[in-house]
């Protein structure tokens, strides 16, 4: 069932503390007759009567095995304040479905947004994609491997920016090699629920699900802002790896590390006015909207 909620006095205006409202339409199915997790939420600024607002499409984390579209913290509030429509999607999870099907769900959800978001005041041709942790991998992949969206009849041209947050799987072969090298050097048990368990043992699939594999000039890949916690060597290395590959293909990309944080707090604090990563995010979005 689709739920409609009016969140009066829900958004704090960053410039002065005046509260704005937002309208949430929850649990919209993006696959007709689909799985209970093939649903998304749409947040719209209640006080804004304008149309063609830019859209932020958010993908939750949780190791591809858990998590929920409600894990957005203050992001919908502050982005509604800034004149965005905010969409948060669910997707089916491991081990019930394969990784290929998870990415396919994200593509189907994005295609729904492209088709339907104008009804909610959003611009179907100005969509930004972001996600945290596992959602960062999915965001980066969907913005670089155009096959998923092409299958749904959508071009990468409608994506105007990508904001992956603290992902460690933009280059899956490297993260697997890192974990196995560490185990060989320092000993201890290999993880029973690590990347090999999630992505399988086929090296071709490791490449297939790695965003860096698909980066190339001329594909209409959008600019990237890659946020990460520098205290984690894996996410730091992966952020810089993705940035380097993007820049080599002449795609605008910046990697920003927020030191006073951790994996969870980086996501939780994103959107707070005094947060350094938030300032980077707003500068990134503003520069692309103005262009």
What residue ranges belong to the model's regions?
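Alpha/beta-hydrolase superfamily serine-hydrolase fold, recognizing
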Residues: 20-291
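Bacterial N-terminal signal peptides
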Residues: 6-17
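Positively charged n-region of N-terminal signal peptides that target proteins for export
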Residues: 1-5
């Amino acid at each position: 069932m689709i739920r409609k909620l009016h969140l009066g006095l829900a958004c704090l205006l960053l410039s002065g503390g005046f509260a704005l409202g937002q309208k949430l339409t929850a649990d919209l199915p993006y696959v007709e007759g689909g799985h209970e997790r093939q649903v998304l939420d749409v947040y719209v600024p209640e006080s804004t009567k304008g149309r063609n607002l830019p859209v932020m499409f958010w993908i939750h984390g949780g190791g591809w095995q858990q998590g929920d579209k409600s894990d957005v913290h203050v992001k919908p509030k502050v982005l509604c304040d800034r004149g965005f429509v905010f969409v948060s999607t669910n997707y089916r999870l491991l081990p019930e479905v394969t990784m290929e099907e998870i990415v396919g769900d994200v593509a189907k959800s994005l295609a729904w947004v492209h088709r339907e978001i104008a009804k909610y005041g959003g611009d179907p041709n100005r969509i930004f994609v972001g996600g945290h942790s596992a959602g960062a991998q999915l965001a980066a992949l969907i913005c670089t491997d155009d096959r998923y969206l092409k299958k749904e009849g959508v071009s990468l041209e409608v994506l105007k920016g990508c904001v992956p947050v603290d992902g460690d799987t933009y280059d899956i072969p490297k993260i697997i090699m890192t974990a196995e090298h560490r185990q060989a050097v320092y000993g201890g048990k290999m993880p029973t629920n690590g990347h090999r368990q999630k992505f399988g043992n086929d090296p071709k699939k490791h490449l297939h699900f790695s965003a860096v594999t698909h980066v190339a000039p001329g594909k209409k890949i959008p600019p990237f802002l890659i946020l990460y916690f520098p205290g984690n060597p894996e996410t730091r290395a992966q952020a810089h790896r993705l940035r380097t590959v993007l820049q080599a293909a002449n795609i605008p990309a910046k990697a920003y590390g927020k030191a006073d944080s951790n994996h969870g707090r980086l996501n939780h604090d994103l959107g707070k006015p005094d947060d350094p990563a938030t300032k980077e995010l707003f500068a990134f979005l503003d520069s692309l909207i103005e262009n």
